[in-house]
């Protein structure tokens, strides 16, 4: 994969809308030989994000929806830290002029267990957890090891690997070398605990349609042929 492109995509996908997005990138699996370089670049990009007033054109991340939600997000990170995970970027609420708001720094977590809550649960905050994988089989298995299945992305220069990932990752939307953009012509919906049905595209029409079956018989006989199974004609 292109580490620079993947790092930018991961950071933007994790913190867009404050991470308060159903399709946000909340966890990433990086091939082991690229792990250190990728996490270092992600941390660098996160540290460079300007947190503050969303009306300021220089701001890259504004406030979360409420103080209660900010505290919930911080709780995930604090518990991960207490369980032995490493926080390579963020992990704190900014002070100074922003101390009174519901702000939280873009956060990068590594060293978390696959079955930990920060990997398995939806955080809805600007938090990205990164874990290594050694083979495509393992990477796809880890990606699918979650109760959710709304969105995923695969970052690779190899066409065959991208086709395999997009086919085998159990998510309703899979991007290749991007994350987040959605167009109205394409269906949007998930698998597993992410629900069923689709919005957007022609598939969404069914979600707004009450389908009714009306059948009128033109057979005037009192005894219909299909009723023979009940009335047992001799």
Predicted ranges, named:
Residues 1-113, 142, 176, 223-224, ...:
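ALDH superfamily catalytic-core signature
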Residues 50, 77, 100-234:
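Conserved C-terminal structural/oligomerization subdomain of aldehyde/semialdehyde dehydrogenase
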């Amino acid at each position: 994969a292109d580490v620079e492109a993947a790092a930018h995509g991961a950071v933007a996908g994790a913190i867009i809308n404050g991470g308060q997005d159903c399709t946000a990138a909340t966890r990433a699996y990086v091939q082991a030989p690229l792990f250190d370089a990728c996490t270092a670049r992600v941390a660098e990009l996160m540290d460079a994000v300007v947190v503050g007033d969303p009306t300021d054109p220089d701001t890259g991340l504004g406030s979360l929806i409420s103080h209660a939600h900010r505290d919930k997000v911080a709780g995930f990170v604090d518990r991960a830290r207490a369980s032995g995970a490493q926080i390579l970027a963020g992990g704190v609420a900014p002070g100074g002029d922003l101390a009174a708001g519901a702000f939280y720094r873009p956060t990068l977590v590594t060293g978390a267990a696959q079955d930990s809550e920060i990997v398995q649960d939806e955080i809805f905050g600007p938090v990205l957890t990164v874990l290594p994988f050694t083979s495509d089989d393992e990477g796809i298995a880890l990606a699918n090891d979650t109760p959710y299945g709304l969105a995923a992305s695969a970052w690779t220069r190899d066409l065959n690997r991208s086709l395999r990932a997009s086919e085998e990752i159990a998510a309703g939307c899979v991007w290749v070398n991007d994350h987040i953009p959605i167009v109205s012509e394409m269906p949007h919906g998930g698998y597993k605990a992410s629900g069923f049905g689709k919005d957007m595209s022609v598939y969404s029409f069914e979600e707004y349609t009450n389908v009714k079956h009306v059948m009128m018989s033109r057979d005037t006989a009192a005894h219909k042929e299909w009723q023979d199974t009940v009335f047992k004609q001799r």
